A protein has these predicted regions:
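Soluble catalytic regions of large protease machineries
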Residues: 1-174
Length: 174
């Protein structure tokens, strides 16, 4: 993760693949959407307001949620339906929904449902881990970039401190 502005972006997150995956699972895609929306949630939690900074993340989350619904049959409403097809590469290789206007409206509703659920999950996770969020934010303000290893070190340190605090709380309660 970097907060150094590059190429018109205010910062950049590049997840490294944990292993070679030819196919993504529904669960993994939902996690990716949740991560994509984490920046917007963090803005709300920290600043009490939102900015344009998460626009690319929102675009990416929306595209992934839409693909889950229209291409991969990974939604509750359209389980076994492929609703989207790719146009010829001579026509900009765009995609076309192969459904009625009413079904397209339901697709939009399903995409919004997926995004809202992922947003609420990101909010829950960041609220529960607020101390970690604050420490990682402070690290980024100082260093401008954080590696996955540095991120996990901070995460485990905060978790260990929280566990120690709760252990002491239990001892004093007895």
């Amino acid at each position: 993760v970097s907060i150094i502005p590059t190429g018109g972006a205010g910062g950049y997150t590049m997840p490294l693949p944990e292993r070679d995956e030819m196919y993504n699972t529904k669960g993994k895609m939902l996690q990716d959407i949740t991560v994509d929306l984490g920046g917007r949630v963090a803005e709300e939690l920290i600043f009490g307001d939102i900015t344009t900074g998460a626009s690319q993340d929102i675009k990416q989350a929306t595209a992934l949620a839409r693909a889950m619904v229209t291409q991969y049959g990974m939604s509750e409403k359209f389980v076994l339906m492929g609703l989207e097809s790719r146009e010829s590469m001579y026509l900009d290789n765009g995609s076309v929904l192969n459904c009625s206007d009413e079904t397209a409206s339901h697709v939009d509703e399903e995409v919004m449902r997926i995004l809202k659920e992922a947003y609420e999950e990101a909010k829950r996770l960041l609220t529960e881990n607020r101390e970690c969020l604050d420490q990682i934010s402070a690290f980024l303000i100082e260093k401008e970039t954080i590696t996955g290893k540095e991120f996990m070190e901070i995460f485990h340190k905060v978790r260990d401190e929280a566990n120690e605090y709760h252990q002491e709380e239990l001892i004093f309660a007895e």
